[in-house]
Amino acid sequence: MTEPAQAIRLDIPRPAPEVVKGFQGLATTAISDVVDLGSVMRYAIHPLWPDIPRIAGPAFTVRTAHHDNLMLHAAIYRAEPGDVIVVEAGDDSMAVAGGNVCAIAQKRGVAGFIVDGVIRDIGESRANGFPLFARGRSPIPAAKEGPGEINHPIRCGGVVVHPGDIVVADDEGIVVVPLAKAPEVLKKAQAKAEADGKLSLEAWEKSHRAKVDATLKAKGYLG
């Protein structure tokens, strides 16, 4: 962990608002089609209830110590409206946040939490419409002692996340788009989504079968 005096960073690079808005209109499936596999979080980090609202925004990163949640509780007062708080938790046995912390984060404009760890009071956040993605839930609260970090690179769901990267999460999964590549990825994903939207099921079926049959033939399969 970083020394306390350098542990909290607030001056981070951020994507242009129009880029963030563009990603808010895209499903993770459209984005994952145009990024590498290392940008998609593992399925262990998942929505904590069905039909969860999609979130997309700049990553506000947090690292907590084992059995501790101090830095996440500090982050809710430091994140900007629209930020997605992304957490590398120290373990998955004690909750790093509960109903009140989530409610305050929502009141202050945070888009949602993505936690490589566990959360509690899920029913309250579901009722309030505050999106939570995590490994799971635990009724046990963590301590508030530290150490920890805010806005340093972290690893969440197997993906390295830098402050200011764009994070998109929905029922299908979670994708992290590096800040420097965000405009390029947005353009490709929008084009892919538009093309897919214009393709009828009949046309897709015809193209799909032709590709499958050609691949089978090229590899020597019969039948």
Predicted feature locations:
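Feature captures the catalytic cores and cofactor-binding loops of soluble hydro-lyases/lyases
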Residues: 2-163, 177-223
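C-terminal binding/interaction regions
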Residues: 167
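Channel- or pocket-lining gating/hinge segments that regulate access to a cavity or pore
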Residues: 173-175
